[in-house]
């Protein structure tokens, strides 16, 4: 479903594509070095790094330069209030735990919403040098090493043939623990942060 005019989609799509490339360059020029880690929680563990904050500041600055009236909501620095119909939702590093241990599956996640409805989404993977892009007009592609390729979900998967990716988070009740062996039989692939969901959109996985 197309929510915006074609010219608006082109404007925001070009901005986000350029931002993806800028984020990868920013990582290699400024953030590919030792960093500090702190815990957001008094009880439990929810890590945040100096790189999380640096990425979010960079993204906010790029948005504010181009669209100063838009609302911006980020994981690390909260919300910038605005009366605009447009809002940007930022997760500067999705997969901070992976980032901390050097796993390359972490990403920069950005969504542009119009009147509360997502219209454009970006998942950028700097280490893998690729990004996934989607619009509400049903156009999706992956850009890898500068080459774009259209992507589609696998609509022919069956229960017996499906490729399932999963992970367990938090504590599980005894009743739920008893169901784990049933899930493990189908769990052929580990869950790799937003990359697993990107692979779902690409048709490489069927269930996440």
Tell me what each language-model feature is.
Residues 153-208:
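An extended, acidic
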Residues 1-93:
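N-terminal subdomain of lithium-sensitive/metallo-dependent phosphomonoesterases centered on the IMPase/IPPase/PAP
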